[in-house]
UniProtKB/Swiss-Prot annotation:
Electrogenic antiporter that exchanges one cationic monoamine with two intravesicular protons across the membrane of secretory and synaptic vesicles. Uses the electrochemical proton gradient established by the V-type proton-pump ATPase to accumulate high concentrations of monoamines inside the vesicles prior to their release via exocytosis. Transports a variety of catecholamines such as dopamine, adrenaline and noradrenaline, histamine, and indolamines such as serotonin. Regulates the transvesicular monoaminergic gradient that determines the quantal size. Glycans are attached at residues 84, 91. Changing residue 228 to A: Reduces sensitivity to reserpine. Changing residue 339 to A/N: Abolishes serotonin uptake. It comes from Homo sapiens. This is Synaptic vesicular amine transporter. Changing residue 34 to D: Abolishes binding to dihydrotetrabenazine. Reduces serotonin uptake. Strongly inhibited by reserpine and tetrabenazine. Also inhibited to a lesser extent by ketanserin and fenfluramine. Reserpine and ketanserin inhibit by blocking the substrate-binding pocket. Tetrabenazine traps SLC18A2/VMAT2 in an occluded conformation and its inhibition is specific to SLC18A2/VMAT2 but not SLC18A1/VMAT1. Changing residue 316 to A: Abolishes dopamine uptake.
Amino acid sequence: MALSELALVRWLQESRRSRKLILFIVFLALLLDNMLLTVVVPIIPSYLYSIKHEKNATEIQTARPVHTASISDSFQSIFSYYDNSTMVTGNATRDLTLHQTATQHMVTNASAVPSDCPSEDKDLLNENVQVGLLFASKATVQLITNPFIGLLTNRIGYPIPIFAGFCIMFVSTIMFAFSSSYAFLLIARSLQGIGSSCSSVAGMGMLASVYTDDEERGNVMGIALGGLAMGVLVGPPFGSVLYEFVGKTAPFLVLAALVLLDGAIQLFVLQPSRVQPESQKGTPLTTLLKDPYILIAAGSICFANMGIAMLEPALPIWMMETMCSRKWQLGVAFLPASISYLIGTNIFGILAHKMGRWLCALLGMIIVGVSILCIPFAKNIYGLIAPNFGVGFAIGMVDSSMMPIMGYLVDLRHVSVYGSVYAIADVAFCMGYAIGPSAGGAIAKAIGFPWLMTIIGIIDILFAPLCFFLRSPPAKEEKMAILMDHNCPIKTKMYTQNNIQSYPIGEDEESESD
Protein backbone atom coordinates (compact mmCIF):
# COMPACT_ATOMS: atom_id res chain seq x y z
CA MET A 1 0.00 0.00 0.00
CA ALA A 2 2.82 2.37 0.95
CA LEU A 3 4.68 1.55 -2.27
CA SER A 4 1.62 2.28 -4.40
CA GLU A 5 1.09 5.62 -2.64
CA LEU A 6 4.76 6.49 -3.15
CA ALA A 7 4.49 5.60 -6.83
CA LEU A 8 1.39 7.77 -7.14
CA VAL A 9 3.14 10.74 -5.50
CA ARG A 10 6.14 10.30 -7.81
CA TRP A 11 3.84 10.14 -10.84
CA LEU A 12 2.07 13.32 -9.73
CA GLN A 13 5.38 15.17 -9.35
CA GLU A 14 6.57 14.02 -12.77
CA SER A 15 3.26 14.99 -14.35
CA ARG A 16 3.46 18.47 -12.90
CA ARG A 17 6.89 18.94 -14.49
CA SER A 18 5.72 17.63 -17.86
CA ARG A 19 5.88 20.17 -20.68
CA LYS A 20 3.47 18.06 -22.72
CA LEU A 21 0.84 18.30 -19.99
CA ILE A 22 1.24 22.09 -20.00
CA LEU A 23 0.77 22.02 -23.78
CA PHE A 24 -2.40 19.95 -23.31
CA ILE A 25 -3.78 22.46 -20.77
CA VAL A 26 -3.21 25.38 -23.15
CA PHE A 27 -4.66 23.34 -26.04
CA LEU A 28 -7.81 22.54 -24.04
CA ALA A 29 -8.21 26.13 -22.79
CA LEU A 30 -8.03 27.51 -26.35
CA LEU A 31 -10.35 24.75 -27.61
CA LEU A 32 -13.14 25.53 -25.13
CA ASP A 33 -12.72 29.29 -25.40
CA ASN A 34 -13.13 29.17 -29.16
CA MET A 35 -15.99 26.68 -28.99
CA LEU A 36 -17.86 29.23 -26.87
CA LEU A 37 -16.73 31.96 -29.27
CA THR A 38 -18.19 30.23 -32.33
CA VAL A 39 -21.06 28.15 -30.93
CA VAL A 40 -23.15 31.33 -30.83
CA VAL A 41 -22.54 32.16 -34.51
CA PRO A 42 -25.49 30.14 -35.91
CA ILE A 43 -27.62 30.52 -32.76
CA ILE A 44 -27.71 34.27 -32.10
CA PRO A 45 -29.04 35.62 -35.46
CA SER A 46 -31.85 33.05 -35.57
CA TYR A 47 -32.58 33.31 -31.84
CA LEU A 48 -32.82 37.12 -31.85
CA TYR A 49 -35.07 36.97 -34.92
CA SER A 50 -37.34 34.41 -33.23
CA ILE A 51 -37.48 36.45 -29.99
CA LYS A 52 -38.63 39.52 -31.88
CA HIS A 53 -41.26 37.73 -33.95
CA GLU A 54 -42.57 35.62 -31.08
CA LYS A 55 -43.10 38.87 -29.20
CA ASN A 56 -45.07 40.31 -32.12
CA ALA A 57 -47.15 37.13 -32.41
CA THR A 58 -47.92 37.19 -28.68
CA GLU A 59 -49.13 40.79 -28.89
CA ILE A 60 -51.48 39.91 -31.76
CA GLN A 61 -52.84 36.83 -29.99
CA THR A 62 -53.55 38.76 -26.78
CA ALA A 63 -55.40 41.45 -28.70
CA ARG A 64 -57.60 39.02 -30.66
CA PRO A 65 -59.88 37.53 -27.91
CA VAL A 66 -61.40 40.94 -27.14
CA HIS A 67 -63.42 40.71 -30.32
CA THR A 68 -64.29 37.02 -30.23
CA ALA A 69 -65.70 36.83 -26.71
CA SER A 70 -68.49 39.33 -27.31
CA ILE A 71 -69.81 37.75 -30.47
CA SER A 72 -69.19 34.02 -30.23
CA ASP A 73 -72.20 33.09 -28.09
CA SER A 74 -74.73 35.62 -29.48
CA PHE A 75 -74.58 35.26 -33.25
CA GLN A 76 -74.28 32.39 -35.69
CA SER A 77 -73.66 34.75 -38.63
CA ILE A 78 -72.67 38.40 -39.14
CA PHE A 79 -73.58 40.67 -42.07
CA SER A 80 -70.73 43.00 -43.07
CA TYR A 81 -71.80 46.42 -44.40
CA TYR A 82 -68.16 46.99 -45.42
CA ASP A 83 -68.12 44.42 -48.24
CA ASN A 84 -71.83 43.31 -48.31
CA SER A 85 -71.03 39.73 -47.28
CA THR A 86 -72.30 37.30 -44.62
CA MET A 87 -69.80 35.46 -42.39
CA VAL A 88 -70.60 32.20 -40.55
CA THR A 89 -69.22 32.35 -36.99
CA GLY A 90 -68.49 28.66 -36.32
CA ASN A 91 -65.26 27.96 -34.44
CA ALA A 92 -62.98 27.21 -37.40
CA THR A 93 -64.48 29.87 -39.65
CA ARG A 94 -64.47 32.55 -36.98
CA ASP A 95 -60.81 31.98 -36.18
CA LEU A 96 -59.86 31.99 -39.84
CA THR A 97 -61.84 35.15 -40.66
CA LEU A 98 -60.56 37.15 -37.72
CA HIS A 99 -57.01 35.98 -38.35
CA GLN A 100 -57.30 37.11 -41.96
CA THR A 101 -58.71 40.52 -41.07
CA ALA A 102 -56.34 41.21 -38.18
CA THR A 103 -53.07 39.95 -39.65
CA GLN A 104 -53.71 39.66 -43.36
CA HIS A 105 -50.26 40.94 -44.34
CA MET A 106 -48.53 38.36 -42.15
CA VAL A 107 -50.51 35.45 -43.61
CA THR A 108 -49.82 36.62 -47.15
CA ASN A 109 -46.09 36.78 -46.52
CA ALA A 110 -46.04 33.39 -44.81
CA SER A 111 -47.83 31.68 -47.69
CA ALA A 112 -45.62 33.27 -50.31
CA VAL A 113 -42.32 32.38 -48.65
CA PRO A 114 -41.12 29.01 -47.32
CA SER A 115 -40.99 28.72 -43.53
CA ASP A 116 -37.20 28.84 -43.44
CA CYS A 117 -37.13 32.20 -45.25
CA PRO A 118 -37.52 35.25 -42.98
CA SER A 119 -40.48 37.34 -44.05
CA GLU A 120 -39.23 40.86 -43.36
CA ASP A 121 -36.00 41.97 -45.03
CA LYS A 122 -35.94 45.23 -43.07
CA ASP A 123 -35.68 43.31 -39.81
CA LEU A 124 -32.78 41.27 -41.15
CA LEU A 125 -30.91 44.38 -42.28
CA ASN A 126 -31.33 45.95 -38.85
CA GLU A 127 -30.22 42.70 -37.23
CA ASN A 128 -26.86 42.96 -39.05
CA VAL A 129 -25.89 45.81 -36.74
CA GLN A 130 -27.35 44.24 -33.59
CA VAL A 131 -25.66 40.89 -34.12
CA GLY A 132 -22.41 42.57 -35.18
CA LEU A 133 -22.24 44.60 -31.97
CA LEU A 134 -22.98 41.53 -29.86
CA PHE A 135 -20.20 39.52 -31.51
CA ALA A 136 -17.77 42.45 -31.34
CA SER A 137 -18.35 43.10 -27.63
CA LYS A 138 -16.25 40.08 -26.59
CA ALA A 139 -13.27 41.14 -28.67
CA THR A 140 -13.60 44.78 -27.58
CA VAL A 141 -13.48 43.86 -23.88
CA GLN A 142 -10.63 41.44 -24.55
CA LEU A 143 -8.79 44.19 -26.40
CA ILE A 144 -8.99 46.47 -23.36
CA THR A 145 -8.08 43.72 -20.88
CA ASN A 146 -5.08 42.20 -22.70
CA PRO A 147 -2.38 44.76 -21.78
CA PHE A 148 -3.25 44.44 -18.09
CA ILE A 149 -3.11 40.63 -18.26
CA GLY A 150 0.28 40.83 -19.98
CA LEU A 151 1.68 42.99 -17.17
CA LEU A 152 0.02 40.77 -14.56
CA THR A 153 1.71 37.62 -15.89
CA ASN A 154 5.10 39.33 -15.60
CA ARG A 155 4.38 39.99 -11.91
CA ILE A 156 2.64 36.81 -10.70
CA GLY A 157 3.38 34.23 -13.40
CA TYR A 158 1.03 32.34 -15.72
CA PRO A 159 -0.94 29.77 -13.62
CA ILE A 160 -3.17 32.19 -11.68
CA PRO A 161 -4.33 34.19 -14.76
CA ILE A 162 -5.08 31.07 -16.81
CA PHE A 163 -7.12 29.60 -13.93
CA ALA A 164 -8.97 32.90 -13.52
CA GLY A 165 -9.82 32.64 -17.21
CA PHE A 166 -11.44 29.26 -16.57
CA CYS A 167 -13.60 30.65 -13.74
CA ILE A 168 -14.81 33.61 -15.80
CA MET A 169 -15.52 31.46 -18.85
CA PHE A 170 -17.66 29.08 -16.78
CA VAL A 171 -19.82 31.96 -15.52
CA SER A 172 -20.15 33.34 -19.06
CA THR A 173 -21.22 29.93 -20.43
CA ILE A 174 -23.95 29.55 -17.80
CA MET A 175 -25.20 33.07 -18.57
CA PHE A 176 -25.44 32.22 -22.28
CA ALA A 177 -27.46 29.11 -21.45
CA PHE A 178 -30.16 30.93 -19.50
CA SER A 179 -30.19 34.44 -21.03
CA SER A 180 -33.42 35.27 -22.84
CA SER A 181 -32.83 38.92 -23.73
CA TYR A 182 -30.33 40.83 -25.87
CA ALA A 183 -28.97 42.72 -22.83
CA PHE A 184 -28.02 39.57 -20.90
CA LEU A 185 -26.50 37.98 -24.01
CA LEU A 186 -24.39 41.13 -24.43
CA ILE A 187 -23.18 40.92 -20.82
CA ALA A 188 -22.33 37.21 -21.21
CA ARG A 189 -20.40 37.88 -24.41
CA SER A 190 -18.49 40.78 -22.84
CA LEU A 191 -17.63 38.72 -19.77
CA GLN A 192 -16.23 36.03 -22.03
CA GLY A 193 -13.76 38.61 -23.34
CA ILE A 194 -12.12 38.93 -19.91
CA GLY A 195 -11.83 35.15 -19.55
CA SER A 196 -10.41 34.78 -23.06
CA SER A 197 -7.79 37.41 -22.36
CA CYS A 198 -6.59 35.51 -19.29
CA SER A 199 -6.51 32.16 -21.09
CA SER A 200 -4.87 33.19 -24.35
CA VAL A 201 -2.22 35.63 -23.07
CA ALA A 202 -1.16 33.44 -20.14
CA GLY A 203 -1.39 30.26 -22.22
CA MET A 204 0.78 31.40 -25.12
CA GLY A 205 3.24 33.09 -22.77
CA MET A 206 3.53 29.88 -20.75
CA LEU A 207 4.33 27.87 -23.88
CA ALA A 208 6.92 30.40 -25.04
CA SER A 209 8.66 30.25 -21.66
CA VAL A 210 8.64 26.44 -21.47
CA TYR A 211 9.68 25.71 -25.08
CA THR A 212 12.76 27.88 -25.62
CA ASP A 213 14.07 26.50 -28.92
CA ASP A 214 12.65 28.50 -31.84
CA GLU A 215 11.82 25.52 -34.07
CA GLU A 216 10.33 23.51 -31.20
CA ARG A 217 8.33 26.54 -30.09
CA GLY A 218 6.88 26.91 -33.57
CA ASN A 219 5.82 23.26 -33.57
CA VAL A 220 4.06 23.36 -30.19
CA MET A 221 2.37 26.67 -30.96
CA GLY A 222 1.03 25.08 -34.12
CA ILE A 223 -0.40 22.31 -31.92
CA ALA A 224 -1.85 24.83 -29.45
CA LEU A 225 -3.42 26.78 -32.30
CA GLY A 226 -4.86 23.44 -33.36
CA GLY A 227 -6.93 23.68 -30.17
CA LEU A 228 -8.15 27.07 -31.32
CA ALA A 229 -8.90 25.54 -34.71
CA MET A 230 -10.76 22.62 -33.17
CA GLY A 231 -12.92 25.05 -31.21
CA VAL A 232 -13.68 27.03 -34.34
CA LEU A 233 -14.30 23.75 -36.19
CA VAL A 234 -16.66 22.15 -33.68
CA GLY A 235 -18.46 25.28 -32.44
CA PRO A 236 -20.81 26.29 -35.29
CA PRO A 237 -22.10 22.82 -36.33
CA PHE A 238 -22.27 21.71 -32.69
CA GLY A 239 -24.31 24.79 -31.80
CA SER A 240 -26.60 24.76 -34.81
CA VAL A 241 -27.51 21.06 -34.60
CA LEU A 242 -28.22 21.11 -30.85
CA TYR A 243 -30.10 24.42 -31.19
CA GLU A 244 -32.44 23.05 -33.85
CA PHE A 245 -33.06 19.60 -32.38
CA VAL A 246 -32.70 20.17 -28.59
CA GLY A 247 -32.88 23.89 -27.82
CA LYS A 248 -30.77 26.95 -27.10
CA THR A 249 -29.71 25.89 -23.60
CA ALA A 250 -28.26 22.47 -24.53
CA PRO A 251 -24.99 23.45 -26.29
CA PHE A 252 -24.01 25.84 -23.50
CA LEU A 253 -24.66 23.30 -20.73
CA VAL A 254 -22.46 20.74 -22.51
CA LEU A 255 -19.75 23.38 -22.84
CA ALA A 256 -20.05 24.27 -19.15
CA ALA A 257 -19.38 20.63 -18.21
CA LEU A 258 -16.26 20.56 -20.41
CA VAL A 259 -15.03 23.83 -18.90
CA LEU A 260 -15.34 22.30 -15.42
CA LEU A 261 -13.16 19.39 -16.55
CA ASP A 262 -10.54 21.82 -17.83
CA GLY A 263 -10.59 23.67 -14.50
CA ALA A 264 -10.02 20.44 -12.56
CA ILE A 265 -6.94 19.61 -14.68
CA GLN A 266 -5.56 23.14 -14.22
CA LEU A 267 -6.07 22.94 -10.47
CA PHE A 268 -4.19 19.65 -10.33
CA VAL A 269 -1.26 20.53 -12.59
CA LEU A 270 -0.67 24.27 -12.34
CA GLN A 271 -1.37 24.82 -8.61
CA PRO A 272 -2.65 28.34 -9.32
CA SER A 273 -2.41 29.45 -5.68
CA ARG A 274 1.36 29.84 -6.07
CA VAL A 275 2.72 33.18 -7.28
CA GLN A 276 5.62 32.67 -9.71
CA PRO A 277 6.93 36.03 -10.96
CA GLU A 278 9.45 36.37 -13.77
CA SER A 279 13.10 36.43 -12.71
CA GLN A 280 13.80 39.56 -14.78
CA LYS A 281 11.96 42.67 -15.85
CA GLY A 282 10.38 42.45 -19.28
CA THR A 283 10.50 45.05 -22.05
CA PRO A 284 7.90 47.81 -21.52
CA LEU A 285 4.74 47.42 -23.57
CA THR A 286 5.21 50.85 -25.18
CA THR A 287 8.66 49.84 -26.43
CA LEU A 288 7.28 46.68 -28.01
CA LEU A 289 4.50 48.68 -29.68
CA LYS A 290 7.13 50.92 -31.32
CA ASP A 291 8.90 47.95 -32.89
CA PRO A 292 7.88 47.97 -36.60
CA TYR A 293 8.50 44.24 -37.01
CA ILE A 294 6.18 43.36 -34.14
CA LEU A 295 3.57 45.73 -35.63
CA ILE A 296 3.77 44.03 -39.05
CA ALA A 297 3.34 40.59 -37.46
CA ALA A 298 0.43 41.89 -35.36
CA GLY A 299 -1.14 43.53 -38.43
CA SER A 300 -1.04 40.23 -40.32
CA ILE A 301 -2.86 38.48 -37.46
CA CYS A 302 -5.41 41.30 -37.25
CA PHE A 303 -6.37 41.63 -40.92
CA ALA A 304 -6.33 37.89 -41.67
CA ASN A 305 -8.73 37.19 -38.79
CA MET A 306 -10.84 40.25 -39.60
CA GLY A 307 -12.01 38.44 -42.73
CA ILE A 308 -13.57 35.51 -40.89
CA ALA A 309 -14.77 37.88 -38.14
CA MET A 310 -16.78 39.85 -40.69
CA LEU A 311 -18.26 36.63 -42.04
CA GLU A 312 -19.54 35.40 -38.67
CA PRO A 313 -22.42 37.87 -38.20
CA ALA A 314 -23.03 38.72 -41.86
CA LEU A 315 -22.88 35.33 -43.61
CA PRO A 316 -25.76 33.63 -41.69
CA ILE A 317 -28.01 36.64 -42.28
CA TRP A 318 -27.06 36.76 -45.98
CA MET A 319 -27.79 33.01 -46.24
CA MET A 320 -31.19 33.45 -44.54
CA GLU A 321 -31.97 36.26 -46.96
CA THR A 322 -30.74 34.77 -50.25
CA MET A 323 -30.64 30.97 -49.79
CA CYS A 324 -33.56 30.34 -47.37
CA SER A 325 -31.10 28.29 -45.28
CA ARG A 326 -32.29 26.21 -42.34
CA LYS A 327 -30.89 26.72 -38.84
CA TRP A 328 -28.42 23.83 -38.98
CA GLN A 329 -27.04 25.06 -42.32
CA LEU A 330 -26.08 28.42 -40.80
CA GLY A 331 -23.45 26.68 -38.68
CA VAL A 332 -22.43 23.97 -41.13
CA ALA A 333 -21.49 26.68 -43.66
CA PHE A 334 -18.45 27.48 -41.50
CA LEU A 335 -17.35 23.84 -41.38
CA PRO A 336 -14.98 23.99 -44.42
CA ALA A 337 -13.19 27.03 -42.95
CA SER A 338 -12.83 25.33 -39.58
CA ILE A 339 -11.50 22.05 -41.01
CA SER A 340 -9.03 23.82 -43.27
CA TYR A 341 -7.84 26.06 -40.40
CA LEU A 342 -7.08 22.93 -38.38
CA ILE A 343 -5.16 21.47 -41.34
CA GLY A 344 -3.33 24.74 -41.99
CA THR A 345 -2.11 25.29 -38.42
CA ASN A 346 -0.83 21.73 -38.08
CA ILE A 347 0.94 21.65 -41.46
CA PHE A 348 2.52 25.10 -41.32
CA GLY A 349 3.41 24.96 -37.63
CA ILE A 350 6.20 22.66 -38.84
CA LEU A 351 6.60 23.69 -42.49
CA ALA A 352 6.71 27.46 -41.92
CA HIS A 353 10.07 27.25 -40.13
CA LYS A 354 11.57 25.47 -43.15
CA MET A 355 10.06 27.58 -45.95
CA GLY A 356 10.30 30.89 -44.11
CA ARG A 357 7.58 32.21 -41.86
CA TRP A 358 7.47 35.53 -43.69
CA LEU A 359 6.73 33.75 -47.00
CA CYS A 360 4.11 31.56 -45.37
CA ALA A 361 2.32 34.63 -43.95
CA LEU A 362 2.58 36.54 -47.25
CA LEU A 363 1.00 33.70 -49.24
CA GLY A 364 -1.63 33.25 -46.54
CA MET A 365 -2.72 36.89 -46.71
CA ILE A 366 -3.10 36.71 -50.50
CA ILE A 367 -5.12 33.47 -50.33
CA VAL A 368 -7.38 34.95 -47.63
CA GLY A 369 -8.11 37.97 -49.82
CA VAL A 370 -8.83 35.99 -52.99
CA SER A 371 -11.04 33.46 -51.16
CA ILE A 372 -13.11 36.19 -49.50
CA LEU A 373 -13.65 37.90 -52.86
CA CYS A 374 -15.17 34.63 -54.17
CA ILE A 375 -17.75 34.17 -51.38
CA PRO A 376 -20.52 36.48 -52.76
CA PHE A 377 -20.62 34.44 -55.99
CA ALA A 378 -22.05 31.42 -54.12
CA LYS A 379 -25.68 30.63 -55.04
CA ASN A 380 -26.24 27.93 -52.40
CA ILE A 381 -24.50 26.35 -49.42
CA TYR A 382 -22.42 24.11 -51.70
CA GLY A 383 -20.97 27.16 -53.42
CA LEU A 384 -19.54 28.31 -50.08
CA ILE A 385 -17.41 25.19 -49.57
CA ALA A 386 -14.37 26.13 -51.70
CA PRO A 387 -14.00 29.82 -50.70
CA ASN A 388 -14.58 29.09 -47.01
CA PHE A 389 -12.01 26.29 -47.18
CA GLY A 390 -9.52 28.73 -48.68
CA VAL A 391 -10.21 31.34 -45.99
CA GLY A 392 -9.66 28.90 -43.12
CA PHE A 393 -6.54 27.31 -44.62
CA ALA A 394 -4.91 30.67 -45.28
CA ILE A 395 -5.68 32.05 -41.82
CA GLY A 396 -4.09 28.88 -40.41
CA MET A 397 -0.97 29.70 -42.45
CA VAL A 398 -0.83 33.24 -41.06
CA ASP A 399 -1.51 32.38 -37.41
CA SER A 400 0.91 29.44 -37.24
CA SER A 401 3.64 31.65 -38.76
CA MET A 402 3.09 34.88 -36.85
CA MET A 403 2.60 33.51 -33.32
CA PRO A 404 6.12 31.97 -33.15
CA ILE A 405 7.57 35.05 -34.86
CA MET A 406 6.27 37.21 -31.99
CA GLY A 407 8.30 35.16 -29.50
CA TYR A 408 11.30 35.09 -31.85
CA LEU A 409 11.26 38.88 -32.25
CA VAL A 410 11.29 39.35 -28.48
CA ASP A 411 14.22 36.93 -28.16
CA LEU A 412 16.08 38.68 -30.97
CA ARG A 413 15.37 42.34 -30.23
CA HIS A 414 14.16 42.62 -26.61
CA VAL A 415 14.13 40.82 -23.23
CA SER A 416 12.76 37.28 -23.40
CA VAL A 417 9.72 37.79 -21.18
CA TYR A 418 6.68 36.87 -23.22
CA GLY A 419 3.56 38.10 -21.41
CA SER A 420 3.49 41.53 -23.06
CA VAL A 421 4.31 40.43 -26.60
CA TYR A 422 1.58 37.78 -26.58
CA ALA A 423 -0.76 40.38 -25.14
CA ILE A 424 0.00 42.41 -28.29
CA ALA A 425 -0.63 39.34 -30.47
CA ASP A 426 -3.94 38.77 -28.74
CA VAL A 427 -4.80 42.47 -29.04
CA ALA A 428 -4.24 42.16 -32.80
CA PHE A 429 -6.45 39.08 -32.92
CA CYS A 430 -9.12 40.90 -30.91
CA MET A 431 -8.97 44.03 -33.05
CA GLY A 432 -9.89 41.84 -35.99
CA TYR A 433 -12.80 40.37 -34.05
CA ALA A 434 -13.86 43.76 -32.63
CA ILE A 435 -13.70 45.87 -35.80
CA GLY A 436 -14.79 43.01 -38.07
CA PRO A 437 -18.30 42.25 -36.76
CA SER A 438 -19.20 45.80 -35.70
CA ALA A 439 -18.03 47.50 -38.90
CA GLY A 440 -19.02 44.51 -41.03
CA GLY A 441 -22.62 44.57 -39.82
CA ALA A 442 -22.95 48.29 -40.54
CA ILE A 443 -21.30 47.99 -43.97
CA ALA A 444 -23.48 45.00 -44.92
CA LYS A 445 -26.57 47.01 -43.99
CA ALA A 446 -25.43 50.13 -45.86
CA ILE A 447 -23.98 48.78 -49.14
CA GLY A 448 -24.60 45.03 -49.03
CA PHE A 449 -22.78 41.82 -48.22
CA PRO A 450 -20.91 41.51 -51.58
CA TRP A 451 -19.27 44.93 -51.16
CA LEU A 452 -18.30 44.05 -47.59
CA MET A 453 -16.42 40.99 -48.85
CA THR A 454 -14.78 43.04 -51.62
CA ILE A 455 -13.44 45.62 -49.16
CA ILE A 456 -11.85 43.20 -46.69
CA GLY A 457 -10.51 40.97 -49.49
CA ILE A 458 -8.66 43.88 -51.12
CA ILE A 459 -7.29 45.03 -47.73
CA ASP A 460 -5.79 41.59 -47.08
CA ILE A 461 -4.16 41.44 -50.52
CA LEU A 462 -2.68 44.95 -50.16
CA PHE A 463 -1.24 44.18 -46.72
CA ALA A 464 0.49 40.97 -47.86
CA PRO A 465 3.74 42.54 -49.26
CA LEU A 466 4.60 43.98 -45.83
CA CYS A 467 5.34 40.45 -44.63
CA PHE A 468 8.52 40.59 -46.75
CA PHE A 469 10.11 42.80 -44.08
CA LEU A 470 9.95 39.88 -41.64
CA ARG A 471 12.32 37.88 -43.84
CA SER A 472 15.43 38.80 -41.82
CA PRO A 473 14.67 41.19 -38.96
CA PRO A 474 17.81 42.76 -37.44
CA ALA A 475 18.78 42.16 -33.81
CA LYS A 476 19.19 45.02 -31.36
CA GLU A 477 22.79 46.19 -30.92
CA GLU A 478 23.24 44.80 -27.40
CA LYS A 479 21.80 41.42 -28.45
CA MET A 480 24.07 41.35 -31.49
CA ALA A 481 27.08 42.09 -29.29
CA ILE A 482 26.23 39.15 -27.03
CA LEU A 483 25.80 36.84 -30.00
CA MET A 484 29.07 37.97 -31.61
CA ASP A 485 30.91 37.69 -28.31
CA HIS A 486 29.78 34.12 -27.69
CA ASN A 487 30.06 33.24 -31.41
CA CYS A 488 27.01 31.02 -31.23
CA PRO A 489 23.46 30.91 -32.59
CA ILE A 490 20.57 32.33 -30.60
CA LYS A 491 19.92 30.41 -27.40
CA THR A 492 16.84 31.85 -25.84
CA LYS A 493 17.44 29.97 -22.59
CA MET A 494 20.18 32.47 -21.63
CA TYR A 495 17.57 35.25 -21.43
CA THR A 496 14.56 33.43 -20.02
CA GLN A 497 13.46 32.99 -16.43
CA ASN A 498 15.21 30.54 -14.16
CA ASN A 499 13.97 26.98 -13.88
CA ILE A 500 12.10 26.91 -17.16
CA GLN A 501 12.29 23.19 -17.65
CA SER A 502 10.64 22.40 -14.32
CA TYR A 503 7.95 25.08 -14.77
CA PRO A 504 5.34 25.49 -13.44
CA ILE A 505 5.34 23.18 -10.43
CA GLY A 506 8.26 21.25 -9.04
CA GLU A 507 9.42 21.92 -5.51
CA ASP A 508 12.98 20.74 -6.22
CA GLU A 509 14.28 23.62 -8.29
CA GLU A 510 17.71 23.46 -9.82
CA SER A 511 19.50 26.62 -10.87
CA GLU A 512 20.98 26.61 -14.34
CA SER A 513 24.55 27.73 -14.84
CA ASP A 514 25.96 28.98 -18.10
